[in-house]
Amino acid sequence: MRKIKTKSIVVIALILIITQAYANKEPEQKDLKPRIVVLTDIAPNDIEPDDMESMIRLLVHADQFEIEALIATTGWSNTGNGERIDLIYDALNAYEKDLPNLMKRSNQKKFANDESKQEIGYWPSVNYLRLRTILGSKNMGMKFIGDGNDSDGSNLIIRMADENDERPIWISVWGGGNTFAQAIWRVQQDRSPEELKAFLSKFRIYT
């Protein structure tokens, strides 16, 4: 019960921190959503319900965040549940059913181009979110950071940092952070120290 409460507090705190950060931005940037990536070791409800609860909580606030990726990865203390990406799809199926009612909050009638920058109040299509739901690292520990350990998740993180977008990318770590660590390793190998520094400056990590 304490862990479930802690995870809920983390999600709420993330909402408050990002909201405050964007409240201090210049007016022309104020209407754009903050960009977020979720790394989750989501598990069945009978094993660890807090991850699914956090996913549902995030989706009912999807009009406040530009969800760049939902990445299924390992936990920090076990081999993880990267193969349970289907649980994220279950949450998205529920989101799809509720979406018509959720859109009424902002009188939204249609969906914008999925690749366009999203304004606060915009509800993303379930197709957009499904395309952004991918696998990250499947193995835990530093010995699995390096050659042969790139994943769809780590590659997407790199591509997002390369996009022409001044907004920082918030990485919310609900499980292990190895997918992000692998992205850092890859950039470190392939780019100059200055380019690595520029890459790292794009991110804000919240665990």
Language-model segments: residues:
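Bacterial N-terminal signal peptides
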Residues: I9-I17
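Bacterial N-terminal signal peptides that target proteins for export
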Residues: M1-I9
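Sec/Tat signal peptide C-region and signal peptidase I cleavage site
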Residues: Q20-Y22
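N-terminal acidic, glycine/proline-rich low-complexity segments
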Residues: N24-T207
